[in-house]
């Protein structure tokens, strides 16, 4: 007998792929009008379970009930037509079409033989008004922020009269203010009786927005608890199967002499303004700042992705020319980019290709062919030294968890033996267990005398991993502090130092929310 309070019941779901049991007898029950968080390390089976719900995968065994009725969706369209929607982490929109086109694509309202644009506009406006979404239905999607694109996807789910909406890492690219707006929308949906399945690695958010939390590990159901009964420590223990006594490894590297000096660095657009700092061998230098502080732009200018306007980059006491990425690479610089899936990996290609791509010319033989033996050897070095979990070198990198993808991205650069490693949000979208492994790896690299510059939006991460923290505000350095002696409040105040009255209103609001 099915519990009438549950809108969704997935019972004893199992799913196998060749050589892998991705789901093993998993049960998930979601109440009507609730926010039910789904948590687990990457590879725990969360996405596979949701793909079984959404008709992308078909389970080998188990049953799915919605409102007490057994369902078996043939595909995602079948799921949508029956009130199940999914807002994916990677937003899939036609950017050159307008917002309402994207909302109603493939099911335009008709007036005779023609599309009824007025009805389409009115229906879109009504949904936006109900959800407090401030977007013009006639704007091109390409003009929207990531947050606005996400709101459009949620509105699209509502337009299908969805009873269940799955949100996969919905806040991974949002500011605190945008997260707050998203939570207001989620609460409106909850009041309308819509159930939200919320997938996230951000434990603070889970505890704030969720009614119940289900935790998975290694393809199995581990626990379902009321969010109010959980703590961050208990969630971590359930997720990883052990206690993480410390969120960050011990800082046992010792910074040595100065290896890099950056003097009055500005970019050609003058968004960076006279950035100066020093980096020592074996040092981890964090870069903090609010959205718009130009942290990523600093790394891109150092690496030659962004044109330098003025200033000097001095390595081992000598000026170096990093005007192009290939020159920066020759000078011993490496950049792990913020958007791993877009700019860090070739998702549809195997691990071996992704491991050697940053150094591919060195694998060419005199005949112009690739030395497959060396490629295999070096790929195995990346897999072993980075502790990558994969069945094969030929596994498509896009099929791996975010943590394993990031390890390969770092490993490919280490094959070049860089001296300066630039890390832009290195743990974004990575679960708590894999984060600890990345922190350990960064610490080990510092012990090997690499100079490391690390951008992060997570304040505890900067304080827990770095030796010093350079704080940026509106393209300028507003202070450099010792990580062991500073506080989050000091860093936040430094982040606001150069905000203008007109240009920094949104960021100033972030300061008020955080401090």
From Swiss-Prot:
ATP binds at residues 40-47. It is found in: Cell membrane. The keyword rRNA-binding does not apply. GO terms for molecular function: ATP binding; ATP hydrolysis activity. GO terms for cellular component: plasma membrane. Keywords: ATP-binding, Cell membrane, Membrane, Nucleotide-binding, Repeat, Sugar transport, Translocase, Transport. It comes from the Bacteria. It is a peripheral membrane protein. The keyword Flavoprotein does not apply. Its main location: membrane. Its EC number is 7.5.2.11. SMART domains: AAA. Gene3D superfamilies: P-loop containing nucleotide triphosphate hydrolases. It catalyses: D-galactose(out) + ATP + H2O = D-galactose(in) + ADP + phosphate + H(+); methyl beta-D-galactoside(out) + ATP + H2O = methyl beta-D-galactoside(in) + ADP + phosphate + H(+). The complex is composed of one ATP-binding protein (MglA), two transmembrane proteins (MglC) and a solute-binding protein (MglB). Belongs to the ABC transporter superfamily. Galactose/methyl galactoside importer (TC 3.A.1.2.3) family. NCBIfam families: PRK10982.1. Part of the ABC transporter complex MglABC involved in galactose/methyl galactoside import. Responsible for energy coupling to the transport system. This is Galactose/methyl galactoside import ATP-binding protein MglA. It comes from Clostridium perfringens (strain ATCC 13124 / DSM 756 / JCM 1290 / NCIMB 6125 / NCTC 8237 / Type A). The gene is mglA.
């Amino acid at each position: 007998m099915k519990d009438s309070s549950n809108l969704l019941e997935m019972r004893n779901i199992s799913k196998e792929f060749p050589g892998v049991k991705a789901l093993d007898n998993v049960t998930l029950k979601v109440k009507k009008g609730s926010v039910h968080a789904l948590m687990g390390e990457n590879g725990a089976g969360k996405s596979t379970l949701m793909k079984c719900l959404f008709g992308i995968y078909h389970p080998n065994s188990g049953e799915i009930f919605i409102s007490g009725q057994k369902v078996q969706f043939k595909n995602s369209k079948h799921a949508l037509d029956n009130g199940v929607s999914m807002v994916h982490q990677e937003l899939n929109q036609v950017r050159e079409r307008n917002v309402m086109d994207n909302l109603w694509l493939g099911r335009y309202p008709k007036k005779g033989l023609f599309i009824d644009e007025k009805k389409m506009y009115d229906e879109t406006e009504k949904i936006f008004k109900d959800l407090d979404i401030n977007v013009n239905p006639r704007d091109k999607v390409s003009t929207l922020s990531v947050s606005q694109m996400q709101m459009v996807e949620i509105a699209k789910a509502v337009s299908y009269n969805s009873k269940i909406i799955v949100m996969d890492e919905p806040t991974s690219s949002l500011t605190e203010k945008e997260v707050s707006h998203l939570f207001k929308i989620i609460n409106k949906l909850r009041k309308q009786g819509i159930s939200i399945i919320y997938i996230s690695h951000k434990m603070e958010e889970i505890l704030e927005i969720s009614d119940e939390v289900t935790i998975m590990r290694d393809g199995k159901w581990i626990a379902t608890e009321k969010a109010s009964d959980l703590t961050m420590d208990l969630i971590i223990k359930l997720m990883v199967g052990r206690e993480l006594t410390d969120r960050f490894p011990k800082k046992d590297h010792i910074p040595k002499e100065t290896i890099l000096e950056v003097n009055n660095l500005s970019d050609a657009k003058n968004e960076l303004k006279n950035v100066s700092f020093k980096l020592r061998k074996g040092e981890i230098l964090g870069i903090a700042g609010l959205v718009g502080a130009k942290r990523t732009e600093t790394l891109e200018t150092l690496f030659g992705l962004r044109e330098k306007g003025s200033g000097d980059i001095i390595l081992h006491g000598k000026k170096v020319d990093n005007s192009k990425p290939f020159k920066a690479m020759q000078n011993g610089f490496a950049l792990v980019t913020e958007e791993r899936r877009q700019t860090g990996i070739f998702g549809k290609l195997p691990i071996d290709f992704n491991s050697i791509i940053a150094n591919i010319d060195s694998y060419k033989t005199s005949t112009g062919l690739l030395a497959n033996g060396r490629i295999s050897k070096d790929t195995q070095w990346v897999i072993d030294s980075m502790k990558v979990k994969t069945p094969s070198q030929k596994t498509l990198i896009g099929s791996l968890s975010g943590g394993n993808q990031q390890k390969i991205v770092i490993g490919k650069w280490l094959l070049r033996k860089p001296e300066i490693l630039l890390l832009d949000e290195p743990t974004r979208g990575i679960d708590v267990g894999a984060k600890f492994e990345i922190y350990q790896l960064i610490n080990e690299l510092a012990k090997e005398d690499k100079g490391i510059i690390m951008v992060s939006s997570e304040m505890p991460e900067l304080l827990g991993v770095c030796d010093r923290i350079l704080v940026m505000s509106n393209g300028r350095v507003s202070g450099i502090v010792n990580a062991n002696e500073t506080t989050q409040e000091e860093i936040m105040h430094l982040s606001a130092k150069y905000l203008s009255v007109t240009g920094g209103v949104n960021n100033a609001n972030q300061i008020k929310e955080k401090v």
